[in-house]
Structure formats: C-alpha cells, structure tokens
A protein has these predicted regions:
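Flexible glycine/proline-rich, aromatic-decorated loop/lid segments
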Residues: 83-88, 154, 176-184, 217-230
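Rossmann-like dinucleotide/flavin-binding elements
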Residues: 1-3, 42-57, 71-73, 90-146, ...
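Non-heme iron-sulfur electron-transfer modules
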Residues: 7, 26, 76-90
Length: 230
C-alpha cells in the first residue's frame, strides 16, 4: 500500500519541478510501471505525525518512510507572517498542482539552488515584470545544473550575488521594499559575514524564499519494522 498526501503520484517530481524542466510524460511512464505491479494506492492520504507512522507499523509488516524534506527553513517572524512572502516549495506546489498562477509584478527570490532557479523561471513564465534572485554567496557556490543561470538571464531574469535579506519594508500594511545587506566570504574559514554600512533596498510586492527545507518529523521510537528511505 502506498499513501500519497497529494491528489497525484510523483512527489516533488510531479508537484514541484516545473514542466519546462521535467516533462510530465516521463513521470507518467514511471508511475504506470509502479501501478502495473498491483500496488494499492491511496491518494490524498496524509501521514503527518510520528504517532501515525508508529500506528501503521502495528498494521503492516513494514513501513518505509520516503516523505522527503518538506518543512521550509524560515528567516524570522516578519517574513513568515507576511502574506506577500511564501516559501518556494509552496509556490511551486500551488502553480503545478493547484493551478493557482498568482504572481506579483516585482518578484524577489532568495536562494541559490534548484528550487530558487525553478521559482525564478516559473515567475517569469507567469508574467512577472521583474524577477531578481539574490544569493548570499558567490556564483561558484551555486548548487544548480550547468547552464541554468544562463537560461535565467536569457529569460530576462537577474541573479545578484553576495547579498542577503534583512528587513521587510511595508507601507500601509503592504509590502513595498526588501532591505538587503551585502556580504563577503572570510578567507580563513569561508564564513559569510555582512559588509558594514552596505544596506540597500529593492522594490518588491512578492518574495519567494528558497532557502532549503528539513524533515517535518521523525519517529521517536526505535521500531524494527520502520525504515527511512528519503
């Protein structure tokens, strides 16, 4: 039995990665191979706590947990509570699975990995007038596929390095600017530090945070028939 929390199989391959980067026919072929094995599938079935997993272990010979890392890293309460700020995975999920194509005019993406690139390029395709991605490290530290940065630039997106988000600037309870700080890498220990008196602001009405994720929960007991596979 396979429990899937979304309305379709495929995980982040299907719900997260944009169609322009991974054609759905490839995923559909793999799903067909799985379903042809006679596996029982329950869609829209969420297993959302360690207690639920432990309960399943009493009803099945073995439980394999392959839920990924979906809990987004956050900056602070100002960012997490602002309705104009959303995390990258939620953004991709609502676009790819829920068909919700809302996008701001001046979009800022924070991050330097696959998700950040996917969010920036998706925002451009949705019609954003301006898309700027900010990464606190240097270009050589990007964790992306070869050619992705060039594709973003060719699509009229921008990538700005050595800058990190600092403060949201609102006007009449509406997001108007993001204040950032320029950064540098210390030579001795490669630590990222702020550059003194280097704050600057960028106009924005929509911020997408793609700064990594972590596991939502894990089993608290050592149970012999529970296995973790990703």
């Amino acid at each position: 039995t396979l429990f899937e929390k979304h309305k379709s199989l495929g995980g982040m391959l299907n719900q997260g990665i944009p169609v322009f980067r991974l054609p759905r026919r490839i995923i559909e072929k793999e799903i067909e191979q799985i379903t042809s094995l006679g596996i029982k599938i329950e869609l829209n079935k969420s297993v959302s706590s360690s207690k639920e997993i432990e309960k399943l272990s009493n009803n099945f010979d073995a439980v394999i947990c392959a839920m990924g890392t979906l809990k987004p890293n956050i900056l602070n309460d100002d960012f997490s509570k602002n309705s104009s700020v959303e995390n990258g995975l939620n953004f991709l999920l609502r676009v790819n699975e829920k068909n919700n194509h809302y996008i701001g005019n001046n979009v800022i993406v924070i991050g330097g990995g696959y998700t950040a690139m996917d969010c920036a390029r998706t925002a451009l395709r949705l019609g954003a007038k301006s898309v700027k991605a900010f990464y606190r490290r240097d270009q050589k530290d990007l964790d992306i596929l070869p050619g992705e940065l060039e594709e973003l630039v060719n699509e009229k997106g921008k990538m700005i390095f050595k800058a990190r988000p600092n403060t949201l600037i609102n006007k009449n309870n509406t997001l108007e600017f993001l204040e950032l700080i320029k950064t540098k890498t210390k030579k001795n220990d490669k630590k990222i530090v702020d550059i003194f008196n280097s704050k600057f602001k960028i106009k924005t009405d929509h911020i997408i945070l793609a700064i990594g994720q972590k596991q939502e929960f894990k089993t608290t007991k050592s149970i012999t028939n529970i296995f973790h596979a990703g």
